[in-house]
Amino acid sequence: MNKLLYLAGRILKPKGLKGELKVLPETDFPESFLQRKLLLVGATEQSAVERRVAGATLQNGFVLLRFYGIDSREDAESIVGERIYITEDDLIPLPPDTAYIHDLVGLRVLDEDCREIGVIRDVLKLPAHEVYEIAAGDKIVLVPAIEEFVVETDLEKGEMTIRRFDEFL
């Protein structure tokens, strides 16, 4: 598989006896699973193979997914722990002033005086809001992804400007 893949979910466990799977969606749009006909499934991006979707439903924040060819609990157990990927073509267009996590990871982080202070390593999803994990020298700093601290995000320049960064050190 040569296309760039994006993590959409993780297979947690079988559900029932007929091959249904409980999936933790790794997306803000779990309902997108309901329209998908094909998904890529594998332990890694490199090992991912296409699987045809036989059905999907949402239940309590999880996706219940069925694939053609996965017809028993034993079949389902054989892919527990694997990841579900989609291609860039399958990404849902975002509203203005929003970005995918993969677009934010790697952005240079600047303070309001345009001094570089680090690089975004990850975006953590916490109950109250997302948090940027920033590698700042030899430290990892967590900054809430809220307007109070984030001045501007410029994906074209590959930069994010943060105010009051010294409060997080």
Curated annotation (Swiss-Prot):
GO biological process, one term: rRNA processing
Function: An accessory protein needed during the final step in the assembly of 30S ribosomal subunit, possibly for assembly of the head region. Essential for efficient processing of 16S rRNA. May be needed both before and after RbfA during the maturation of 16S rRNA. It has affinity for free ribosomal 30S subunits but not for 70S ribosomes.
Domain called PRC barrel: residue spans: 95-168
Major place of residence: cytoplasm
Gene giving rise to this polypeptide: rimM
Any one GO cellular component localisation term in the record: ribosome
InterPro entries xrefs: PRC_barrel-like_sf, PRC_RimM, RimM, RimM_N, RimM_N_sf, Transl_B-barrel_sf
Keyword entries, A-Z: Chaperone, Cytoplasm, Ribosome biogenesis, rRNA processing
Name this polypeptide is given: Ribosome maturation factor RimM
Family listed: Belongs to the RimM family.
NCBIfam families (UniProt xref): 16S_RimM
Written domain comment of the UniProt record: The PRC barrel domain binds ribosomal protein uS19.
Species of the source: Prosthecochloris aestuarii (strain DSM 271 / SK 413)
Entry GO MF terms: ribosome binding
Subunit text: Binds ribosomal protein uS19.
Subcellular localization(s) per the UniProt record: Cytoplasm
